[in-house]
A protein has these predicted regions:
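Non-catalytic positions within long, well-ordered alpha-helices that form the structural scaffold/packing
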Residues: 28-29, 112-113, 178-181
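Generic structural signal for well-ordered alpha-helices
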Residues: 72, 76-81, 104-112, 140-151, ...
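Non-cysteine beta-strand/loop elements that form the S-adenosyl-L-methionine
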Residues: 37-49, 117-126, 184-191
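Metal-dependent enolase-superfamily TIM-barrel catalytic cores that perform enediolate-based chemistry
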Residues: 109-153, 161-164
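N-terminal capping/small domains of soluble enzymes
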Residues: 1-92, 97-99
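Active-site glycine- and acidic-residue-rich loops that bind
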Residues: 16-21, 95-107, 158-184
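Glycine/Thr-rich beta-alpha phosphate-binding loop at enzyme active sites
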Residues: 61, 69, 127-139, 173-176, ...
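Structural preference for beta-strand elements that scaffold enzyme active sites
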Residues: 10-12, 35, 91-95, 117-121, ...
Length: 228
């Protein structure tokens, strides 16, 4: 049970890991999931960062995809209808990203008017883009204002705010999201990290830094959840 959202089970595929579901469905029965969080989607399509974008570390993975996605039009007209047709019982959680308050509101509004979307995750914590993303999720005042506008655009659909761990204190951001009207929080996004290719003596990722995920960040995530 999540705030205003009932699931078959609590196994949820996190945003990004399964794209929009089509690729993952070739290897895995999506009906076994409690829900699928779609890849974070922006107003316009994005090619993402230069390659290589992903590398393995000793305790997880670094990625710097740079919000590569098909854009809101393709997501709502093609990707979500495919999921609804092939997995009609699977609750879909969309993920909205943007580079301004106006973009976030437009993306959320489109998702809110798309059949099959049961909740919307607000990604204000992507560490792999130059503007927007994490920049809007590190200032409590800015975040609270953004969440208020997004909640209005969501037309009653639950909003879960994905918080960045790349701050000194995550608690004020969680409070700002709550005060803005968020129904819940997603904790946490990846931690900014860097890996060196020992053969080339250069960063393993073309973007230099990337977001660290995997076993290494679980204790940090649990600590932040406890703080909140």
């Amino acid at each position: 049970q999540m705030p205003i959202l009932s699931l078959f089970n609590l196994i949820i595929a996190a945003s990004g890991t399964c794209g929009y579901g089509q690729e993952a469905a070739k290897k895995y029965n999506l009906n076994h999931l409690g829900s699928l969080v779609l890849k974070s989607t922006t107003l316009h399509p994005r090619q993402g960062n230069p390659r290589p974008r992903v590398c393995e570390t000793s305790a997880g993975w670094l990625n710097a995809n740079g919000l590569q996605n098909v854009g809101i039009t393709a997501a709502t007209n093609e990707k979500i209808p495919w999921l609804r047709k092939n997995y009609p019982q699977l609750p879909i959680i969309a993920s909205a990203a943007g580079f301004s308050e106006d973009e976030y509101v437009k993306v959320v509004s489109e998702f809110a008017n798309t059949a099959g979307v049961k909740a919307i995750e607000l990604n204000v914590s992507c560490p792999n883009v130059k503007h927007g993303g994490m920049a809007m999720g590190t200032d409590p005042e800015v975040l609270q204002r953004l969440v208020k506008q997004v909640v209005k655009a969501a037309l009653g659909i639950p909003i879960y705010v994905k918080l960045t761990p790349n701050v000194t204190n995550i608690v004020p951001l969680a409070q700002a999201a709550e005060q803005g009207g968020a129904n819940g929080l997603t904790m946490i996004n990846t931690l900014t990290g860097l890996s060196i290719d020992l053969k080339t003596r250069r960063p393993a990722l073309a973007n230099v830094t990337g977001g660290l995920s995997g076993p290494a960040i679980k204790p940090l995530a649990l600590r932040m959840i406890h703080q909140v």
